[in-house]
From Swiss-Prot:
InterPro entries: ExoRNase_PH_dom1, ExoRNase_PH_dom2, ExoRNase_PH_dom2_sf, PNPase/RNase_PH_dom_sf, Ribosomal_Su5_D2-typ_SF, RNase_PH, RNase_PH_bac-type, RNase_PH_CS. Belongs to the RNase PH family. This is Ribonuclease PH. One of its GO terms (biological process) is tRNA processing. It comes from Cereibacter sphaeroides (strain ATCC 17025 / ATH 2.4.3) (Rhodobacter sphaeroides). The lineage of its organism: Bacteria, Pseudomonadati, Pseudomonadota, Alphaproteobacteria, Rhodobacterales. Phosphate binds at residues 86, 124-126. The keyword Transferase applies.
Amino acid sequence: MRPSGRKLDQMRSVSIEPNVMKHAEGSCLIRMGETHVLCSASIEDKPPPFLKNTGLGWVTAEYGMLPRATTSRNRREATAGKQSGRTQEIQRLIGRALRAGIDRSALGERQIVIDCDVLQADGGTRCASITGGWVALRLAVNKLLKAGIVVSDPIVDHVAAVSCGIYAGQPVLDLDYAEDSTAGTDGNFVLTGRQRLIEVQMSAEGASFSRDEMGQLLDLAEAGIADLVAAQKAALG
């Protein structure tokens, strides 16, 4: 039995509220159970220096957590004077994931920065950030298309992410913190709307896992991604 009472293949409730910020070119608030992440997209009219005069655009991401997103207060990283290794790893993952869903030549020489701020954390914050970040990106690109700044749509597919793991000996979908903190194996799966793999991160936290178990988790992830893509489409109308 899962702590939440969910079935093994059952996602947490998912909602995505678009256009929650006045100034950002794209924004949304994604809720996956008790994990809530505010995602925004900001368009910059020039690419990073390494892409100057290449005709290619770029999508990058920044990630952070509010001090009381967790059960006890975390010190702000700005106060500490540097980002943690975990933060750097997560924001690189978000950027890689979202870039896999765009045609950078169609985007042109500009950069879109996705900011993901965790308001409340209960497991799966990086997955929620990718899923919500894509919606913010989509909304920002829509503005570029409407203004005629870009001619062809640079977004080639949906991108979403979900966690899966082995909890109490059973493969489960969309781990919350109670499960994630004690899972024998956990993983993050990033897929496109067409169910193509972008990134898989899996690790054995306790015992090793088999190839068959990995396949079971991928099957769960594919079903979860389908639900998340449906939520993205519903948010965009």
